[in-house]
Structures are given as C-alpha cells and as structure tokens.
C-alpha cells in the first residue's frame, strides 16, 4: 500500500498532468486493469460501451507482479516470461470478448507492465495524458469489492488519484451495462 504524505514518508502520487483528451490528435482512453476475475468483464463491457459511444479508446493494462524469486535469477526470468505469456493470453481472451460484444472495431491498446499494481497504474496514467477515466469492476463476493477497488477507490489514494474512477457493480449483466454506459 502507498504511504500517506507527510511525517517523512515518501509521497508516490506525482503532480497531476493536464489531460489532453479533447485536444486535436488526442482522444479519451478508458483504462481497464485486466485479469481473470469475473468483475473484470463487467469493467471491460462498461469501458468498451463508453468508449464506443464517445469516440474513445481502451487502454488495457496487465501488470506482472514481482515474485519472491529475485535471489534466483533463472527462476525469476522464467516467472517473468510466464507472466508476460499469461498477459498475452488474457489480451487474446479479452479481444474475443470485445468482438463477441460487438466492439471489434474499437481501438484497444494492450499494455504490459512489471511491478506493483497500484504503482504501475499511477505511472501509466501519468505517462499517457489521453487516459481520462479508470474503470474497475466490483466483485459480488460478500467479503468485499476486491483488493484493487478497495485499495484505489476506498484507500488512502482516493482523494488524490489523478483521474476519476468508475466502479461497475459485478452483478450487472452485459445488457444492463450497455444500457447505462
């Protein structure tokens, strides 16, 4: 988790950059962190519907988190390659899902990062000034909405996150999502 500012702690939230989504040559991107959870499909459906209706695009982010193998160089490299291959497989899966939802012509940038997920999300938002909205899916699990929703939308970062976060309830069907997006 990111430390709170002040009292000698490191403040990881950089100054917010101006978004350029309406400038000539730019268009709004909806950021979706992709994984294999059911709620991710809800986020994808909402983001794709919004991007399609507003002439936007998708930025699909997969983060390969570091393992505990850093002292075993060969094992770390194998784990890294497996993570990248898994990311590519997830992108293929979500490409098929977008096509089945009728969004095959929607621009979807595929981004693979290595590191801690919350830090990589902030980095990609700061690097790409066209990313204007992050879309997360909330889990239907009674234990909570999921670790990413909890960390980003209800955690210490929420008041200073660089862009708005849209949270899609996990119990909405794709038709309901398309209707409200």
Regions found by a protein language model. Give the residues of each.
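Short, hinge-like loop/turn segments at secondary-structure boundaries
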Residues: 75-79, 127-128, 152
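General small-molecule cofactor/ligand-binding pocket signal
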Residues: 59-61, 109-113, 166-168
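Small/aliphatic-rich secondary-structure junction motif
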Residues: 20-74, 160, 181
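Helix-adjacent hinge/juxtasegments
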Residues: 79-107
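Acidic, proline/glycine-rich short linear motifs
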Residues: 4, 8, 15-20, 62-89, ...
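Structural beta-alpha unit
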Residues: 2-25, 99-134, 172-176, 181
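Glycine-rich, Arg-bearing micro-motifs that act as flexible, cationic patches
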Residues: 133-159, 173-178
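Active-site phosphate/pyrophosphate- and oxyanion-stabilizing loops and adjacent acidic/basic residues
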Residues: 48, 123, 155
């Amino acid at each position: 988790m990111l430390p709170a500012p002040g009292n000698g702690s490191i403040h990881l939230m950089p100054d917010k950059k101006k978004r350029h989504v309406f400038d000539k040559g730019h268009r709004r991107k909806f950021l979706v962190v992709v994984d294999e959870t059911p709620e991710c499909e809800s986020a994808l459906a909402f983001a794709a519907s919004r991007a399609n209706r507003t002439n936007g695009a998708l930025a699909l982010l997969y983060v390969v988190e570091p393992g505990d193998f850093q002292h075993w160089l060969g094992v770390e490299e194998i784990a890294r390659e497996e993570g990248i291959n898994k990311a590519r497989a997830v992108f293929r899966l979500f490409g098929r899902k977008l096509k089945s939802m009728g969004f095959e012509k929607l621009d979807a940038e595929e981004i693979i990062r290595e590191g801690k997920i919350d830090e990589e999300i902030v980095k990609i938002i700061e690097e790409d000034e066209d990313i204007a909205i992050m879309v997360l899916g909330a889990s239907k699990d009674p234990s909570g909405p999921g670790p990413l929703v909890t960390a980003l939308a209800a955690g210490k970062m929420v008041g200073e996150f660089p862009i708005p976060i849209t949270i899609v309830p996990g119990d909405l069907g794709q038709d309901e999502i398309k209707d409200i997006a």
